[in-house]
Amino acid sequence: MSQRGNGVMETDARRLEIDRTRMAEDLRGVVAGDVIFDDAGRSLYSTDASLFRLPPLGVVRPRSVEDVAATLEWASRNGVPVHPRGAGTGLAGDALGSGVILDCSRHLRRIIRTADETVCVQPGVTCRQLEAHLAAVGRCFGPDPANAAVTTLGGMIGRNTSGSRFPLYGAVRDRIVSAEVVLSDGTVTELRPTAVTNWGNAEGLTADAARRATLARGIAAVHGAAQDELASWAASGRLVHGGYRLDGVVCPPISDGAATLIDLPRLLAGSSGSLAVVTTVTLKTRPTVAGAAVGLFFFDSLERAAAAALRLQPLVPAACDLFDKRHLALSRSASPTFERLIPALAEAGLLVEFAGDDQAGCQRQLDDAVELMRRSRFHCIDVRRAEVAADVELFWQLSRTVVSTLHGVRGTVRPVQFMEDVVIPPGQLPAFLERYQDVLKRHSATALLYAHAGHGQLHVRPFADPRRSGERERLEALAADLVGEVVRLDGTIGGEQGLGLSRTRFFAEHFPGQVSVCREIKRLFDPAGLLNPGKIVPAAAESRPAWRQLPQTFPESVGLPLLNWTPEALAAEVDACNGCGACRADAGPLRMCPRFRESPGEEWSPRAKANLVAGLLGGEVDPQAAGMEAARAIADTCFNCHQCRVDCAAGVDIPALVTELKAAVVAAEGLRWTPWLLARVDRLSALGGRLRPLSNWALTNPQARWLLERLLGIAQGRRLPRFTGNAFLRWAARRGLTRPSRRAGPRVLFFLDTFARRHDPLVARSLVALLERSGVGVFIDPRQVASGIAAISVGDLDLARRLARRNLRVLTEAVRLGYEIIATEPAAVTAIQHDYPLLLDDEELPRVVAATRHATDYLWELQQEGRLVGGFEPLPQRLLYHQPCHLRQHGGGQRTAGLLRLIPNLSLDTRPTGCSGMAGTFGLDHDHYRTSLRIGRTLLTAVREPELTGGVTECSACRLQMEQATSKQTLHPVVLLAIAAGLAPKDALSGDNLRPATAAGRVATVPAAEG
C-alpha cells in the first residue's frame, strides 16, 4: 500500500511537472518578458518579508502592459490565480500565492513623464528613485516608508503606505490621480475619477470609457447598498484602514444638476493587487519642504512617552514616532553613534519633527515642544536636537532602521513579523498600552513596540521561536487577543502593511459587514476571484499557509552541507534571513548588492540565495542535474564581494551560503572550463612568468588576445598586468627574508598574493621597506601558496581546501613562533579569516584568524604607537581613493586614508564610488566583462576626471579596473607611503605596469547600464 501510495505521489508530481511545462510554453508564446517555472526560480518567490512560505506555480516578469494583459488573459482562460508583486517586502504575505506571481519590479521601472504637479511612473519604480527624481525639480511625493530604498510604487499602492510623516503628507491614496490598469480578464483600462451619468447608455463611448462607466456605476450601487454599514462605522468613530475603502471614493454632487463622481483609482490603494494590476500611475506631487527640526525626547516609562505624544499634537508635528526600551537598547548596541545619543536609562523615546518652509519657524516649534516637556509632568529625562540637515538625517535613521535593527537579533528567539500594523484613535494610546501589557502578561510573552504615535499606527513584534512546536498556535492566540483589544478601543487593523495572509482572517472575524462590502467590490472588478485571492476577502476554501521554517531533517539526496559546519548551523544561517529585502537597494549609502544594482532581478538579490538553499534543504528544489542547472545560474549571480554580509542588519552570511550552492553545483555537474582555469589564476601567472617575454608580447598582440579569449575565455578587451616571474621571492631570499627572523621586537609573516608576487613586486618591496624602517622583522615563507579565494569564488572546494591546508601549516608555524600575519591583498585576508574556517576543521585556525590583518591596518597601528617611519616628503598629487569591498568588510579604508593624509601635499578624494565590478577574476571572464564595466561605471567615471592625477586602492583587481579606461596610474597605498618615505623610486608615480588590451592601445568604453 505504501509503495502504491508512493507511486501515486510520483505520478501526481510528474503530472504537475508536465502541466507546469505546458503552462510555461503557453506563456512564453504570448509574453516577451521572463517566464520562470523551474523549481529553483519558483523557490525565490515562495517568501517575502512575512513569516510565510508558499511556493507559486510559476513567475512572469512582464516587460510591458501587453505582457501583463496577455498573462491575465491566459490566467482567466485557464482559471489560474495571479499574484502581483513588487519588491516582496511586505510583512503580511500580500505578495505570496499558489498561482502565478506577476513580478512588476524587474522591468516596469520607468519614470514616464513629469509635469508641474504630477508624475507618471511604472509600478517597479522605487520610492527612493522617485523622490530623487522629483527633488531635482524641487518637488516630492511624500509618503515615506522606512524601506524607501527598496519599496516599489506598486507595493506602496497595494498597501496604501503612509509612513512616519502621515500628518504632513497623508497616505498613497491621497496622491493618486489616475492609473492604467489591467483587469482580471486581460482588459486594459484607465481608471480616473468618473462621473456617474447615463448609466444605461453606452452609445458613443469607447470600450475603455464604457468599462470605466460600468465600474463607476457598480461602485455607486455598492455604496448605496452599504449605507447602513458605512453609517454605523462612521458613528462609532472608528478609523477606516484595512480593506477596500469607500471613504473619499464616492464624491456627492457639488451642485444641483452635477453628477456623483466616483474616484476609481483611489480604490486601488490598499487593495493588495486584488482588484486590478497597475501598469502606470499618475501621482500628485508637492513642493519639497525647505525647513525641518527634529527632537529626540527620552522618558522613564513608555506610558509617559505616550502621554507626551498626545500632549504634543496641538503643536502639529509633521511626525511623532514612539520607541520602546527594547528598540532603544537594540539601537544602542548596533551603533556607537546611537550609543552616545540614547541615554542608557531611557525606557522610551519620541522622535518629533516639525517641518515647513521656514527653518526658523521649525526651530521655534521645536523650542515650544522642549519647553512644553520641561513644564509638564512627563518625566522627560533628556532631549537631543537636530536642526541642520545632516543631524536631521542621523536622527531619522533611528526610525528608518527600526525594522533592520530588529533583524539584527540573532538566535532562535527573536522579534517576529506576525502581528504588525494595528491602528487605534491616537487619544486611546495610553489605554491601549495598558491593555497591551495585560495581553502580554496573560500569554507570558515579551514584545517590542514601535508606533507612529501621532496618527495611531502601532507595530507590535512578539519575541518567539517560529521553529518551536506549538509556537504558531501560541502566537495566533496572542494576536487574536490583542486584535480584540484594538477593536474594543474603536481601532482596526491593516494600517500601512495591508491585511495579507496574516490579518485577513482577523478582519473577517471582527468586521463581517465591511468584508461583505469588500466582497461586492471584488466581484465587480474580479468576478472570477483570480487576482490575489485570499487577501482582504477570505477565499472560499481558505488554506493555512505554512510558515517558512526548515524541516528538522533534510533529504539525503541534497548532500549538504559541503562546508565545515553542521546541518543545524547551515539551517540556522538560512533561517536568519527574514526576507526584508534591504539587499535589493538600488542606490544609497549601502554598497550591497553590486550585482543586483546592475541587474535588478530577484535572482540577483542576496536573499535569493538564502531562499534557494532553503528550497534545496526543504525538498522544493531537485538537487539532481535538472534542478542544479537553474541553481547554477542563480548562484553565479554572486561574485563573492561580501557586501551583503557587511550591510545586512541580520548579518546573514550569504557568501557562505553561495559557496555551498556553487560547491553543490560543481559536485553535481562539474566546473566549466573558464571558471576552472580562473580558479587556478596563480598557476597561469606562474606560467606566464616563466614564458616571458613571449607572454608579455602576447598581452599586446590583438591576434594573440583573440586566441586567448577563444581558448581560455579571458576577455580580449581587458587590460592585463605584465608578468614579472618570481623576481620578488629571489630578492627576498637574497635579503634573508625567507627564513624566520631571530631579531627581537615585533615580527610579521608577509602573506604574499598573486599580484604582488608575480605582477607588481614593487608593492611587496615597498611594504618590506616600510616595515623594516619601522623596526618590524619580516618573514616571507617560500612554502606559502595562493590564498584560494579564486577557487572559493567559483565553488572549487577541492582545490580551495588543498591550498588552505598548505597555507595553514605555514601560518600555524609562524603564529606559534610569535609572528603576526599581514597581507597587502584584502581578499587574501578574507580567505584566511572567513573562508578557511568554513573549509577546514583545525583547532589552530582561531589563533591564525586572530593574528591576521591587512597591511594598512597594521601600519596604522604602528602610526598610532609612534613607531611608523616618518619624515614623509611632499607628493603633489590629487588621487581618487577607492575602498575595496573586501577591505570594507574588515572595517578598513578610513585607516588607509589616515595613513595617506600623513603625506604632505597629497590631496585625497574619498568620495563613495561603490564596487569596482572587477571582483577578483570575475572581470577577466569574457562572459562577465561588460557586466563588470557596468557595475564599475561610477568608479570609472570618477577616475577619468581631469583634475585627478591618478588613483589609489589596496585591491589589485580594483586597480586593474581603475586603469582599464584611463592612462592614469593607480597605486597601492604602501607604494605611495614608500615613495614619500624615500624608500621607493618616485618614477613609480608615472610608471605603467599594465599593457593595453590591443597593440593599438584602444581604451575600452563603459557599456550603457541595463534598463
Where are the regions that the model predicts?
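N-terminal flexible segment immediately upstream of the FAD-binding catalytic core
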Residues: 1-73, 77, 87-117, 146, ...
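N-terminal glycine-rich flavin-associated loop
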Residues: 15, 27, 50-82, 104-147, ...
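C-terminal substrate-recognition/cap domain of FAD-linked oxidoreductases
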Residues: 37-45, 250-253, 260-261, 265-477, ...
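A gly/ser-rich beta-alpha-beta helix-loop segment of oxidoreductase catalytic cores
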Residues: 51, 91-92, 128, 134-178, ...
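Long hydrophobic segments that form regular secondary structure
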Residues: 251-275, 297-315, 429-439, 559-652, ...
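Terminal amphipathic helices with adjacent charged low-complexity linkers/tails
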Residues: 314-413, 447, 451, 537, ...
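Ferredoxin-type iron-sulfur electron-transfer modules and their immediate structural context
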Residues: 488-492, 500-502, 507-637, 655-670, ...
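Iron-sulfur cluster-binding electron-transfer modules in prokaryotic oxidoreductases
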Residues: 526, 533, 547, 655-1011
